């Protein structure tokens, strides 16, 4: 138990796992289900958008999105997410977690539907409308990151807190999987209802007019899970840690948690007064914050930034990589709906076999192995498998070796999710003071989305062939897939090194990790090494 801890917070820390824990996981997790669905489903339909809106009569290949437009469609939601993480992270500390939580969800619901209703007289007009609503969709999604993580960390007990926060994040895997399954069902249904020839046989006829409904339906379905959880989000009480430590209303915090835990909680007035007298109140831009948490914030931001460069590059452009190794046939040999079906099938298999299991391995082991060990291990194996793909890349492009490529590629996803993709979400929700927790998580997550933007825009160009004859229309020559994968391997290695800045929070209360109740004059530098300090001397 942390020094002079409030009874209500201690009650939460030692509470047995019970129904309200799982209720909180589902309520917060469905937001992440929607987040992942909305952010990743666009990669399933970008080739279809190109066929519908950028078809050129007589061209040897189907239409594709021009380079700048493709980058915008893929990247604009990330820019919105980054903005939302910073804004709602800050707002969650100012107004409270609960008050802001409903705003983010309604924004996600409204904008998911609006994306599917994108309109315009020209192709560019439709895409511009889509990008506008995807920005605001991302803005709402961004708010869900710091708020969901903070709420779950502040509700959880210290013994299984890591598993609970990771379980919320693991719903992202189901969101990615659901995006693929929905795309499979919708494209298969339309493909059977509206048969079409291949592009090489009949050009424009390979994209039936009804294909315009396919991408809209896929995009709009993302609103349903969020809409279903709105009522329950509004019924959740404010977290006790915000009410007691930030709003300074220990009586209300005790009353709220008495109902949740079904136990009587009474605060000792002397303890409350002592905490209020001895507690710290430094701000985000103070020297005291820099001294206590500066390296922690550097660690959480740098690891998340580097991870997302690689993670989102792989996720958003796996369809292009699979095409280049021949796992998905050339586009001219398929019709539009068949192409959506095959891309969705490939991404669903990857999600089912590696992405989803990786998340839940983290849930199972995070409170046994610890955050640091999982993050270091995951970063190490991501580096190993990425170089194993990149260096003998020509070997993997041969037809007889394609299955091996897919297996190796899947393993990089597995160790991303049984590794830094999960732990970078968990740790910032545990190591900062309550009054700055949501803000610092938002800053860390925004650094991650900055990495995603680098990946989404950079990899799109970098992976283009070095041979001008093999470059996609409208793109400059790049460094090729092989060299792009080598760069991602180097990024993973840097992520492994930056993990050394992240402290271990396994088995400790949030107040113990953040030194919430220690005065600003106390000697912060005398803490013991090991689990109570940095994972390594820095």
Curated annotation (Swiss-Prot):
Which domain of life, per UniProt?
A: Eukaryota
What does the UniProt induction comment state? Accumulates during arbuscular mycorrhiza (AM) formation after inoculation with AM fungi (e.g. Glomus intraradices).
Give ranges for the Cytoplasmic compartment: 1-24, 92-99, 144-164, 233-292, 367-371, 424-442, 505-538
Compartments it resides in: Cell membrane
Residues in compartment: Extracellular = 46-70, 121-122, 186-211, 314-345, 393-402, 464-483
Q: Which GO terms describe its cellular component?
A: plasma membrane
Q: Which UniProt keywords apply?
A: Cell membrane, Membrane, Phosphate transport, Symport, Transmembrane, Transmembrane helix, Transport
Q: Which molecular function GO terms apply here?
A: phosphate transmembrane transporter activity; symporter activity
Task: Enumerate the catalysed reactions.
Answer: phosphate(in) + H(+)(in) = phosphate(out) + H(+)(out)
Q: Where is this region: Disordered?
A: 506-538
The residue ranges flagged as biased composition, category Basic and acidic residues, are: 506-517
Bilayer-spanning residue ranges: 25-45, 71-91, 100-120, 123-143, 165-185, 212-232, 293-313, 346-366, 372-392, 403-423, 443-463, 484-504
Expressed, tissue-wise, as follows: Expressed at low levels in non-mycorrhized roots.
Membrane protein topology class = Multi-pass membrane protein
CDD domains documented for this protein: MFS_PhT
Q: Which Gene3D superfamilies match?
A: MFS general substrate transporter like domains
* GO BP terms, alphabetized: phosphate ion transport; response to symbiotic fungus
What is the annotated role of this protein in its UniProt record?
Answer: Low-affinity transporter for external inorganic phosphate (Pi) probably involved in the acquisition of phosphate released by arbuscular mycorrhizal (AM) fungi during AM symbiosis.
Q: Which PANTHER family does the entry mention?
A: SOLUTE CARRIER FAMILY 22 MEMBER
The extra comment attached to this record reads:
Although related to the sugar transporter family, it does not transport sugars.
Q: Which NCBIfam families match?
A: 2A0109 (TIGR00887)
| Family, as annotated | Belongs to the major facilitator superfamily. Phosphate:H(+) symporter (TC 2.A.1.9) family.
Q: What is this protein called?
A: Low affinity inorganic phosphate transporter 3
Q: Which organism is it from?
A: Petunia hybrida
